[in-house]
UniProtKB/Swiss-Prot annotation:
It is a peripheral membrane protein. Coiled coil: none annotated. PANTHER family: HIGH FREQUENCY LYSOGENIZATION PROTEIN HFLD. Its main location: cytoplasm. Disulfide bonds: none annotated. InterPro entries: HflD, HflD-like_sf. The gene is hflD. This is High frequency lysogenization protein HflD homolog. The keyword Nucleus does not apply.
Length: 205
């Protein structure tokens, strides 16, 4: 298997890892701090020498690989909600890629967060609010808003909303990288077995 296939599958796992957290937070109102940090850190690595630099926390990425196997494998337990989020994110990524203005603003706002991290942890509420603001101001404006399902009690909380938007930004970052590495939506239909095999192999590395 080629290195590019491994890297592309890693980026796709990054999308699903972020989506899994969105789903969990929407239903339960809290999140795993390490997994959240791993996803948010991926947004900040904008000029990596390799894909593995973007996903430094390999343990956190395991959930993404497991979801690839569950969603694209031969098992019957497909999660329709995950598929809906994934389709929405990939559609927004296409719109983002066509907007040089949005990409420029995105880069500028991410640099502001880099500066903020000299004073705060990446999972600090203020930092998460800034990640969420980037998603709301730039990405969300590009197309139809993703409708997140979950517990209304948690979804009405500002902190929950901000974590979800921050994680959707992380999913977008991985979607951009996946596309840059040659990922195409048709691969999810016609190359499913190859992607699943690569994910399963990646879980054993």
């Amino acid at each position: 298997m080629s290195d590019q296939l491994f890297e592309r599958t890693m980026a796709f796992a990054g999308i699903l890892q972020a989506v899994a957290q969105v789903q969990y937070i929407a239903r339960h109102g809290d999140s795993d701090k390490d997994a959240l940090a791993a996803s948010l850190n991926s947004v900040l690595v904008t000029n990596p020498d390799s894909t593995s630099e973007v996903y430094a926390d390999k343990e956190a990425l395991k959930k993404g690989y497991q979801m690839i196997v569950a969603q694209l494998g031969d098992g019957k337990q497909k999660d329709v909600e995950v598929t809906r989020y994934l389709v929405g994110i990939l559609a927004l990524e296409r719109k983002l890629a066509r907007s040089a203005n949005a990409m420029g603003m995105l880069s500028e706002r991410i640099n502001q967060i880099h500066r903020q991290l000299s004073h705060f942890e990446i999972t600090d509420e203020q930092v998460i609010a800034n990640f969420a603001g980037i998603y709301s101001d730039i990405v969300s404006e590009l197309g139809p808003k993703l409708q997140i399902s979950g517990n209304p009690e948690f979804l009405k909380r500002t902190q929950t909303q901000q974590k979800i938007r921050a994680l959707l930004l992380s999913a977008m970052r991985s979607a951009v990288l996946w596309r840059q590495l040659g990922g195409k939506r048709r691969h999810l239909v016609f190359a499913r077995k190859t992607i699943v095999d690569t994910a399963m192999k990646s879980l054993t590395l």
